[in-house]
Regions:
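A motif-centric feature for acidic-aromatic and gly/ser/thr-rich catalytic loops and repeats
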Residues: 102-186, 193, 219-221
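Residue-level recognition of short loop/turn positions
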Residues: 18-19, 29, 40, 61, ...
Length: 262
């Protein structure tokens, strides 16, 4: 339970299972969201029956490859994502459109490519013509939103940015949940407001002495699985895989150099 005091106090409720996976969230407005996971702990679905919205997730290893959105039990959009490790390379977004009731619905597809910083965080998306179609809003060092995507130092007076192009990523491996403000980080949930994880590290003390800590510096370090911080992504992935009993990553896996060398 998360409670905020004030003139209009608010209470948010979270439900966790025995594996410390978030299975339910109730907002201060009474919206109930349900989350489902597969046997490997990967999120496969989130839904809100009150809003008649449902998202399904298709995985490629530990990276999300496809997100489908359903509204009123009908497929509304499909987002395909291509990663180099945990760095977004490109995405293809398709949505059904019906400009007029007399016209049959048609699927419209747009392909965009990403530019990321040294940690793999998306900085912008551009189309095949080289025009910027999306960029993130301002955030604090730990990812807390300080502005909307269109409310930045470089405004969008012509309305050229596309909100639907937002891939939904914060830091490497972190997927933003608009309903709760949390970020789904594979094995755990990250809270940008505090810069901490909500549950203890599944690795215990093997992941570090501070089991709720994210990373020392998000500008130099990443934790795409929510297990342990790392500067060399391939080394970190193999270390986490060994501890969890999973298959090791290949030697040419996407690599990020040590933070002190960046």
């Amino acid at each position: 339970t998360k409670h905020r005091d004030g003139y209009r106090p608010e209470t948010e409720r979270f439900r966790w299972d025995s594996r410390d996976q978030l299975t339910g969230y109730c907002s201060a407005q009474g919206e109930l969201w349900e989350y489902r996971h597969d046997a490997s702990g990967r999120r496969t679905e989130k839904r809100c029956d009150r809003k008649k919205i449902r998202f399904t997730y298709l995985w490629d290893g530990d990276s999300i490859a496809e997100i489908r959105e359903y509204r009123d039990d009908e497929l509304y959009s499909v987002r395909h994502l291509v990663f180099n490790g945990f760095e977004l390379i490109s995405q293809q977004f398709s949505r059904v459109r019906q400009p007029h009731p007399s016209v049959a619905p048609q699927w419209v597809t747009r392909t965009n490519h990403a530019v990321s910083d040294l940690t793999g965080r998306p900085l912008m998306l551009f189309n095949s013509e080289g025009k910027t179609v999306w960029r993130p809003g301002q955030t604090s060092l730990w990812g807390l939103a300080l502005s909307l995507p269109a409310d930045t130092d470089d405004p969008d007076p012509r309305g050229e940015l596309d909100p639907e192009a937002d891939p939904g990523l914060l830091y490497a491996g972190q997927w933003r949940d608009a309903e709760s403000g949390l970020c789904y980080n594979r094995f755990r949930y990250y809270e940008p407001e505090s810069g901490m994880y909500l549950v203890s590290d599944p690795l215990g003390l093997q992941g570090g002495e501070q089991t709720y800590r994210y990373v020392p510096n998000p500008l130099r370090w990443i934790d795409p699985l929510g297990l342990n911080k790392g500067a060399s992504l391939s080394k970190m992935m193999n270390s986490s895989s060994d501890l969890m009993g999973l298959r090791r990553q290949p030697q040419n896996f996407w690599r990020l150099y040590r933070g002190k060398d960046i």
